[in-house]
Curated annotation (Swiss-Prot):
Pfam families registered for this protein in UniProt: zf-Tim10_DDP (PF02953)
Subunit comment: Heterohexamer; composed of 3 copies of TIMM9 and 3 copies of TIMM10/TIM10A, named soluble 70 kDa complex. The complex forms a 6-bladed alpha-propeller structure and associates with the TIMM22 component of the TIM22 complex. Interacts with multi-pass transmembrane proteins in transit. Also forms a complex composed of TIMM9, TIMM10/TIM10A and FXC1/TIM10B.
Membrane topology category: Peripheral membrane protein
Primary localisation category: mitochondrion
GO MF, any single term: metal ion binding
Matching PANTHER family: MITOCHONDRIAL IMPORT INNER MEMBRANE TRANSLOCASE SUBUNIT TIM9B
Designated name of the protein: Mitochondrial import inner membrane translocase subunit Tim9
Functional note: Mitochondrial intermembrane chaperone that participates in the import and insertion of multi-pass transmembrane proteins into the mitochondrial inner membrane. May also be required for the transfer of beta-barrel precursors from the TOM complex to the sorting and assembly machinery (SAM complex) of the outer membrane. Acts as a chaperone-like protein that protects the hydrophobic precursors from aggregation and guide them through the mitochondrial intermembrane space.
Superkingdom per UniProt: Eukaryota
Length: 89
């Protein structure tokens, strides 16, 4: 059975998600939408927005992978250090 996440943590995660979503939306909108003379979204604006989102997702994934690699290295270093400290001389 999966552990339940406390409600306060769920709220915090949701607020962080909304903050990230809002920032991404604003960034891509400001970069991609330039013409307000029509109610329709132009194809180049759609393409730009899609590329902006894809770039952000790839960046987020890459940072996550690098963070995991760094965390693993730190854990291995701590384990090695603990192993050395635990051995008699």
């Amino acid at each position: 059975m999966a552990a339940q996440i406390p409600e306060s943590d769920q709220i915090k995660q949701f607020k962080e998600f909304l903050g990230t979503y809002n920032k991404l939306t604003e960034t891509c909108f400001l970069d991609c939408v330039k013409d307000f003379t029509t109610r329709e979204v132009k194809p180049e604006e759609v393409t730009c927005s899609e590329h902006c989102l894809q770039k952000y997702l790839k960046m987020t994934q890459r940072i996550s992978v690098r963070f995991q690699e760094y965390h693993i290295q730190q854990n291995e270093a701590l384990a090695a250090k603990a192993g050395l400290l635990g051995q008699p001389r």
